[in-house]
From Swiss-Prot:
Keywords: Hydrolase, Plasmid, Signal. It comes from the Bacteria. InterPro entries: AB_hydrolase_1 (IPR000073), AB_hydrolase_fold (IPR029058), Serine_prot/Carboxylest_S33 (IPR051601). Pfam families: Abhydrolase_1. Gene3D superfamilies: alpha/beta hydrolase. The active site is at S207, D433, H460. Its EC number is 3.4.-.-. This is Putative hydrolase YuaR. Residues 94-393 form the AB hydrolase-1 domain. Residues 1-26 form the signal peptide. Belongs to the peptidase S33 family. One of its GO terms (molecular function) is hydrolase activity. The keyword Signal applies.
Length: 499
């Protein structure tokens, strides 16, 4: 999921070795073991996993040629992808690979509700999860940790960014980072398919994962059996980073407007149904927190940045709107309840995930250098597109993280514009999705001549979650019987609530 990032307020301390193995990958095998055994029992932290879940590693090349073949060297550097398998309950027909979002989100414990109709899928299909290269339990992982000794004091914001970049490259290794992006991720999917013994790929991709799946569809059209894309990235927009950011910002503001109208109608928080008035009220609250942060029960401050981070995350799912409304109401009253403290703690992505997101996005982008005027103009356009969270009138001319990032592998240069259209694709999108706008799915469905499932409501990604029977039935039907899907609309949360 591409998110509008704000500074993290809590730090997760971690340590990951930044070396990689060497060897050959001809075997392409995964030695499955119970996830309850060492060393896999520590993979999931506090999360629970099924006792039936199997774990293992798949070794793949650190670098591929432009055609996806191994670099010609018997002692090539390898990365290890952390893999999980929930075996089919009866006779196996194949595997369904779950491609997680982010970039930077782990995928070894995918959230899938196996009630009916999803249970039909589980009957004959293995469910495969994996942590993408550089992420989670895969090895080596992106590591941007800085020790206290490495953190310079009394330096400019630009120097702080450069300090962070240097830590990422030094800890992870420049050669690893050079091959950590979407180009390699596409070929990793192909290696996973081969290792599983599947003749063709069956997969469900979420958010950023749809970018990997769409690039795979371009490069390996004949290797596809069935893919579902939920929360769709427009891969034809990847050559213009500013355009997709601008479209995302507009979508976030539209969702904020719908949230404010819902809030006013239900009297859940002190926001007006009038768009301009609601924005003004939210600005007043942000200014209040900016000038006088609240304090939680642990003595940590809650600032305007924290409310912005909470807002951009909780706007994503309609089921989270009541929590966001409570936060707005309580912060307006100078109150912080245990419920909101919990929401703040759970909403802040770990530093590990945030680092991976930033590094992978930057590696995928072209090396674009902006003048001061261009930079300020773009920042103003983004602020105007999502005015609700942009309460500070002065636009900084400070370069962004990716502009200062030195290692790029322009994703557009590695794409294969295949004229053969794959079959078996289904695109899924909420009508009101702030982070991957519905229009992305419409464009990609048209590009691949594929059906589109529109969820008429607010949200971001829903397939196989067990919260919308219409969606799950359509998705399972497509996975079991690809090629028979047509355009369909399912009713979602928020239908008819706001105009």
């Amino acid at each position: 999921m591409r998110v509008i990032m704000k500074p993290l307020r809590r730090t997760l301390v971690f340590f990951i070795f930044s070396v990689f193995l060497c060897g050959t990958v001809s075997a392409r095998q995964i030695e499955w073991q119970s996830c309850m055994t060492s060393p896999y029992s520590d993979w999931f932290g506090k999360e629970s996993s099924s006792p039936e879940l199997l774990c293992g590693y798949l070794s793949v090349p650190l670098k591929y040629t432009d055609t996806g073949k191994d670099v010609s060297d018997e002692n090539i550097p390898l990365v290890r992808l952390a893999m999980t398998k929930l075996p089919a309950k009866s006779k196996r027909k194949g595997s369904v690979i779950i491609i997680s979002g982010g970039p930077g989100l782990p995928g070894i414990n995918p959230y899938i509700n196996f009630d009916w109709p999803v249970t039909n899928l589980r009957e004959s299909w293995d469910i495969i999860g994996f942590d993408p290269r550089g992420v989670g339990q895969s090895f080596p992982a992106i590591n941007c940790q800085q020790s206290n000794q490495e953190r310079l004091v009394n330096v400019s914001e630009k120097q702080l960014i450069l300090q962070k970049i240097n830590a990422c490259i030094h800890n992870t290794g420049a050669e690893v980072i050079r091959h950590i992006g979407s180009h390699e991720a596409v070929y990793d999917i192909e290696r996973i398919r081969q290792a599983l013994g599947d003749k063709q790929l069956t997969a469900v991709a979420y958010s950023y994962g749809t970018q990997i799946a769409a690039l795979y569809a371009e490069r390996f059209p004949s290797s596809i059996r069935s893919i579902v894309f939920d929360g769709v990235v427009d891969i034809d927009d990847l050559n213009d980073n500013f355009s997709w950011k601008l479209r995302q910002a507009h979508s976030y503001q539209e969702t904020f407007d719908r949230f404010a109208a819902w809030c006013a109608r239900t009297k859940s928080c002190p926001l007006s149904s009038d768009r301009n008035q609601a924005i003004h009220q939210f600005h007043q609250l942000l200014l209040k927190l900016h000038n006088s942060p609240l304090t939680d029960s642990r003595g940590e401050s809650i600032s305007s940045d924290d409310l912005i981070s909470l807002t951009t995350e909780l706007l994503l799912w309609r089921s989270s709107w009541p929590t966001l409304a409570t936060a707005v109401r309580q912060f307006s009253q100078g109150i912080v309840s245990n419920e909101i403290e919990t929401a703040l703690n759970s909403s802040i992505a770990s530093e590990k995930v945030s680092d991976a997101l930033g590094v992978i996005l930057c590696v995928d982008q072209s090396d674009e250098q902006l003048s001061q005027e261009q930079r300020k103009s773009r920042k103003k356009a983004l602020a105007d597109a999502f005015p609700a969270v942009n309460f500070e009138r002065e636009q900084s001319d400070l370069p962004e993280f990716c502009e200062l990032w030195p290692i790029h592998r322009d994703l557009q240069q590695t794409r294969l514009k295949n004229t053969v259209l794959p079959s078996g694709l289904l695109f899924v999108a909420h009508k009101y999705d702030p982070t991957t706008p519905w229009i992305n799915a419409r464009k990609m469905a048209d590009k691949f001549s594929a059906p589109l499932l529109t969820i008429n409501g607010d949200g971001h990604t829903l397939a196989l979650a067990g919260t919308n029977l219409c969606v799950d039935e359509a998705v399972v039907r497509h996975l079991l019987f690809p090629g028979k899907s047509e355009d369909i609309t399912c009713q979602g949360s928020g239908t008819g609530d706001t105009n």
